[in-house]
């Protein structure tokens, strides 16, 4: 699963899905309905597996911000692990926005002060003195790719300093506090996902 998360992150990076704040998000309405809050809801009758894959094939038809990108990565990682038939059975209702709307089967949880952080973890780089005119840069959700590299939608792919520098360019005038990596990680419930696949086989 961790390998699938990394591969989905790199695929999303290569496809160059547009970065948009929630108020300006857009999606392919063949598969998704856009909510007023900027999230995307699977259209009735659409195959979940096809809808998720469409984000990676018709990329120009999608634009969203970094939290939703992580949600997309998680669903794509599970799709690649489960394959379409099982995925379609497991996820009949999908909402792409943030953790609160995720299917309970994935059930991501945030763990603080871990002894070890691992590739595939979702980390957060906080910008505590963000410019109030650009609140979208108050932080960046990133996927740990291993070897000190990260992917974050809207900023790109690089080491931690790359993300800190990008966020520091969007601080308020006179800011004294640098952006920093939060001592926490968000992870799907790998055990539950594994057991669901095992019991379905």
What residues fall within each predicted segment?
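Cysteine-nucleophile amide-bond enzymes
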Residues: 1-122, 126-136, 140, 145-201
């Amino acid at each position: 699963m961790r390998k699938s998360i990394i591969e989905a992150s790199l695929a999303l990076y290569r496809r160059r899905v547009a970065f948009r704040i929630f108020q300006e998000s857009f999606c392919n309405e063949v598969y998704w309905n856009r909510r007023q809050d900027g999230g995307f809801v699977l259209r009735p009758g659409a195959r979940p597996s096809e809808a998720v894959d469409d984000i990676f094939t018709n990329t120009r038809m999608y634009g969203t911000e970094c939290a939703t990108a992580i949600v997309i990565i998680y669903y794509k990682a599970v799709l690649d692990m489960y394959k379409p038939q099982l995925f379609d059975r497991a996820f009949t209702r999908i909402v792409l926005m943030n953790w609160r709307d995720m299917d309970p089967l994935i059930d991501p949880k945030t763990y603080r002060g871990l002894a070890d952080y691992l590739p595939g973890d979702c980390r957060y780089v906080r910008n505590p003195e963000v410019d109030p005119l650009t609140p979208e840069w108050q932080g960046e959700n990133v996927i740990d790719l291993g070897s000190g590299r990260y992917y974050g939608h809207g900023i790109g792919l690089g080491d931690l300093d790359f993300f800190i520098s990008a966020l520091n360019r969007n601080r308020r005038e006179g800011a004294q506090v640098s952006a920093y990596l939060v001592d926490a990680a968000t992870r799907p419930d790998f055990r539950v996902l594994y057991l669901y696949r095992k019991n379905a086989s």
